[in-house]
Amino acid sequence: MNELTPQEIVRELDKYIVGQERAKRCVAIALRNRYRRAKLPKELQDEITPKNILMVGPTGVGKTEIARRLAKLVNAPFVKVEATKFTEVGYVGRDVDSMVRDLVENAISLVKSEYMEKMKERAKALVEDRILEILIPEPHARKAGFKNPFEALFGAPSQEPEQTYQTTDDYIRTQREILREKLRSGELEDKVIEVEVEDTVKPPFEMIMGTISDEMGISFQDVFGSLFPKKKKKKKMTIREAREVLEQEEYNKLIDMDEVIKEAIHRAEQHGIIFIDEIDKIAGRGSGVGPDVSREGVQRDILPIVEGSTVMTKYGPVKTDHILFIAAGAFHVAKVSDLIPELQGRFPVVVELHPLTEEDFKKILTQPKNAITKQYIELMKTEGVNITFTDDAIEAIAKVAVKINEQSENIGARRLHTVVEKIMEDISFEYANVEKPIDVVIDKDYVYSKVSDMIKDKDLNRFII
């Protein structure tokens, strides 16, 4: 876990998110407290639980992005779920335990990728040996009338007597070393070979069992593993394609999945972050019928997971006591007080995110590392087109986005994507594979010429069904 101070965490978040200082401070403190807790004696660690956060603010102000960037910053298991997707036990829909199962899957993927990175060089060497064995089999694996592989590959006649070739291991090694150099130089990438691979098509019964096992948290593959033996089949493919397939097989052999699962469950329990979006949509007692049915029930189902319980997954039991939960909602109609009191108590840190202003929009267009204007500049560079956004163009885009948000639904910073896409549409369509580099300057006049139809007829949408 990265030993970042709260100030360092906020500075990292500032690279991607404009404004919302209090929200960034709160998540930074929550993250640092995990590091502080890890330094305490074991018995005291168990007593300290994370202070879950409830973010309140309209759509498009950065709630989800703050949580997502936070998880990436420390390489922590992270999952985003929609509260509206869950239903009370007994109704059709996803049960709330699935968010923990999803977190474990994410943690396993994270840990496995780290193990793969550590074993990358070893796996590449093993794959290289396997490809050479296919190109030049061992003598006992050869069929009668086998030809010198150099003759098969390059049309060169054999320089050794057949008898000597079939019985001399030194000669085989020499040939393989010569081919190894050609493999590494990329000369043989398009050569077609026959590879024995695992059949990835599962029988229908196994597919059904897989779906059920995910929902029940039971691994039927472990229970009935002998009923589903892995099938092999021979497949022709280029060496380039074979390398990817064989690398995956070698990783599966090299990586101890028991160790991966053990580490993944530990990370999910100690460092996992679950982001529950649209929590305001399940607030309120409702009428108990129609669409309101099970709203309070979902809250009561979420409650034990947030306050700490054990969820059974197909990889084993997972404790949720130290998972950090970040909930978010616009709360336009419902209020935070409409959540059941017990659930409110499990989110002691309530942060209000303010709506974005025109000045914020201008910063969003230019300051973040992943600003949409920067993305388009880099995209069009690949076509030989150098895009420049003038300062008055940035100001115009921000004004237009604010205007449209006022006239219709306010979707926050997401409106900037709509406006910029409209501005860039013709350029993206017309300029492809230009013969020589060209410069395109986007100014205020160009912006207004492209978006004029978006800001006129402001009341027209009320007549559209």
UniProtKB/Swiss-Prot annotation:
This is ATP-dependent protease ATPase subunit HslU. ATPase subunit of a proteasome-like degradation complex; this subunit has chaperone activity. The binding of ATP and its subsequent hydrolysis by HslU are essential for unfolding of protein substrates subsequently hydrolyzed by HslV. HslU recognizes the N-terminal part of its protein substrates and unfolds these before they are guided to HslV for hydrolysis. Its main location: cytoplasm. It comes from Caldicellulosiruptor saccharolyticus (strain ATCC 43494 / DSM 8903 / Tp8T 6331). It comes from the Bacteria. One of its GO terms (cellular component) is HslUV protease complex. HAMAP family: HslU. Coiled coil: none annotated. A double ring-shaped homohexamer of HslV is capped on each side by a ring-shaped HslU homohexamer. The assembly of the HslU/HslV complex is dependent on binding of ATP. InterPro entries: AAA+_ATPase, ATP-dep_Clp_protease_ClpX, ATPase_AAA_core, ATPase_dyneun-rel_AAA, Clp_ATPase_C, HslU, P-loop_NTPase. Keywords: ATP-binding, Chaperone, Cytoplasm, Nucleotide-binding, Stress response. The keyword Translocase does not apply. It is found in: Cytoplasm. GO terms for biological process: protein unfolding; proteolysis involved in protein catabolic process. GO terms for molecular function: ATP binding; ATP hydrolysis activity; peptidase activity; proteasome-activating activity. Belongs to the ClpX chaperone family. HslU subfamily. ATP binds at V18, G60, V61, G62, K63, T64, E65, D277, E342, R414.
